[in-house]
């Protein structure tokens, strides 16, 4: 079991597959190209679902690409050593995934016309999902209990740091024309409507049948059965108890796990940390 994180600029990263030199190069040297598309999220926000939807939009619903190429090759995580080397050598438009907070992301992006989609999810559900997910990997120290992980999460002592700072940082770009903010809860409630919104943002015109195919092949069940998307190909030495990337994918699962005291404590921290945002911006509030 990894005893600790790999810290960089005050942010905890997994102890393997993440290198300080690469993180520095991403921020200072990596050039985001105009034709690139960025998928930005805090971990456990529905990243893989969004990647699957975007990939299917690009193929107009044809599932061949998503069923033959692993998800981390279709849209590599730039902050991993493998992802970074794949991206710097890739020609043409690139799909780029990242969990990096805004202050660690490539400086070149902020003066480019590249489009980015930022996906936000209720942090309470992220906390519960993260607890069950990370506890089954060898990538981080095991909290042992949800109560311990709860405390870590509120303090930002979890992978990729504070959810509150991550979301505050990236949402500062929400008025930019090349930046689309999506909410996991909205995708769950109206998947087809969200797919159309992404198509509009990307300038893609899909017919009704093509939209239905995107919907079909990006469903929870379809992704769960797709070995290119469910992370079943991941190395066994990084997994302890049979990693399940796709556990539930539901909204409000935190209510099954938080105590009343935890729910109240979380509400208090949320109100403090997210003060200043317009009322109603978060669909779960």
From Swiss-Prot:
Compartment(s) where it occurs, according to its Swiss-Prot or TrEMBL record: Cytoplasm
Top-level lineage group: Eukaryota
Residue sites binding 3'-phosphoadenylyl sulfate per the record: 44-49, 121, 129, 184, 218, 223, 247-249
Enzyme Commission number(s): 2.8.2.2, 2.8.2.14
Major location (coarse): cytoplasm
Pfam family, one: Sulfotransfer_1
GO CC terms, sorted: cytoplasm
Active site positions, chain numbering: 99
GO molecular function annotation: 3'-phosphoadenosine 5'-phosphosulfate binding; alcohol sulfotransferase activity; bile-salt sulfotransferase activity; steroid sulfotransferase activity; sulfotransferase activity
Entry's family note: Belongs to the sulfotransferase 1 family.
Function statement: Sulfotransferase that utilizes 3'-phospho-5'-adenylyl sulfate (PAPS) as sulfonate donor to catalyze the sulfonation of steroids and bile acids in the liver and adrenal glands. Mediates the sulfation of a wide range of steroids and sterols, including pregnenolone, androsterone, DHEA, bile acids, cholesterol and as well many xenobiotics that contain alcohol and phenol functional groups. Sulfonation increases the water solubility of most compounds, and therefore their renal excretion, but it can also result in bioactivation to form active metabolites.
Name listed for the protein in its UniProt record: Sulfotransferase 2A1
Originating organism: Mus musculus (Mouse)
